[in-house]
Swiss-Prot record:
The keyword RNA-binding is annotated on this UniProt entry: no
Listed name of the protein: Olfactory receptor 5D14
InterPro entries in UniProt: GPCR_Rhodpsn, GPCR_Rhodpsn_7TM, Olfact_rcpt
Record organism: Homo sapiens (Human)
Glycosylation sites: 7, 169
Intervals, Cytoplasmic compartment: 49-56, 123-141, 220-239, 295-314
Keyword annotations of the record: Cell membrane, G-protein coupled receptor, Glycoprotein, Membrane, Olfaction, Receptor, Sensory transduction, Transducer, Transmembrane, Transmembrane helix
Length: 314
């Protein structure tokens, strides 16, 4: 506890090296990431608003989707602004407390999203495999508990890792070779022994991935078998459309997490890690609302209706 208080009182400063060292790429990358961030904010907030104001979407599936959009919006807003700032500003410093909070909030969002994706897979399993029991099985109380559990567990692991990070000694030079305060990059600049934090991170990441992917894969095996039994071509197409959109999001998100955190003794270069990190910090939050809305006629119709309502055409 004394070590934690001492670290907070001394307030060391970190420097984020950013995404690239090449000056000629910084402005083009700034414009690309800015566009992606705008799409992310508009897409996710738009999804939340559409689900909130339209009674047609007051169902468990859209309830979970609204929370997924909220987590994506928060996560992108935690990471991307600092990424954009470092691409155009000479001063790349970040205070100790700000860095720790960025790590904690971003990691919380990642873990929460992984469990929300598992919850959404289970929801689709119940809807497709047991449609007659869907409204009973997926009650409002159960949906609220599943979402609350995702948020609470999303905070638990990152909080434990944060406690260990706060005990580390950062005496400088505190240069983080990343575009945000990612945990492995953050603790690597410490002068303390970081074996335990690394083992904890690997254990938490592996446990979370095993649990969520087991739920997801089991759900989709049953979904796939059930869909093959559907005689109606339109019904089979609709079921596969929902399945495919969810699977696309899962592949991008979990594939990156497995690559970065669940492969021990990885020899990947730091630049490779940065590029991979972009997929789950910038690309995935942007794609999720596009994936779900472009494959959903009801969402597209509601979106254009909202646009025409708010922006009258003469």
């Amino acid at each position: 506890m004394m070590m934690v208080l001492r670290n907070l009182s001394m307030e060391p400063t970190f420097a984020l090296l950013g995404f690239t060292d090449y000056p000629k790429l910084q402005i083009p990358l700034f414009l690309v990431f800015l566009l992606m961030y705008v799409i992310t904010v508009v897409g996710n907030l738009g999804m939340i608003i559409i689900i909130k104001i339209n009674p047609k979407f007051h169902t468990p599936m859209y309830f979970f989707l609204s929370h997924l959009s909220f987590v994506d919006f928060c996560y992108s807003s935690i990471v991307t602004p600092k990424l954009l700032e470092n691409l155009v500003m000479a001063d790349k410093s970040i205070f100790y407390f700000s860095c720790m909070m960025q790590y904690f909030l971003s990691c919380t969002a990642v873990v929460t999203e992984s469990f929300l994706l598992a919850v959404m897979a289970y929801d689709r399993f119940v809807a497709i495999c047991n449609p007659l029991l869907y409204t009973v099985a997926m009650s409002q109380r159960l949906c609220a508990l599943l979402v609350a559990g995702s948020y609470l567990w999303g905070m638990f692991g990152p909080l434990v890792l944060l406690c260990y990070a706060l005990r580390l000694n950062f005496s400088g030079p505190n240069v983080i070779n990343h575009f945000f305060c990612e945990y492995t990059a953050l603790i690597s600049v410490s002068g303390s022994d970081i074996l335990i934090p690394h083992l904890l991170l690997f254990s938490f990441a592996t446990f979370n991935e095993m649990c969520t992917l087991l739920i997801i894969l089991t759900s989709y095996v049953f979904i796939f078998v059930t869909v093959l039994k559907i005689r109606s071509v339109s019904g089979r197409h609709k079921a596969f459309s929902t399945w495919a959109s969810h699977l696309t999001s899962i592949t991008i998100f979990h594939g990156t997490i497995l690559f970065l955190y669940c492969v021990p003794n990885s020899k990947n270069s730091r630049q490779t890690v940065k590029v991979a990190s972009v997929f789950y910090t910038v690309v995935n939050p942007m794609l999720n609302p596009l994936i779900y809305s472009l494959r959903n006629k009801d969402v597209k119709d509601a979106f254009w209706k909202l646009i025409h309502t708010q922006v009258p055409f003469h």
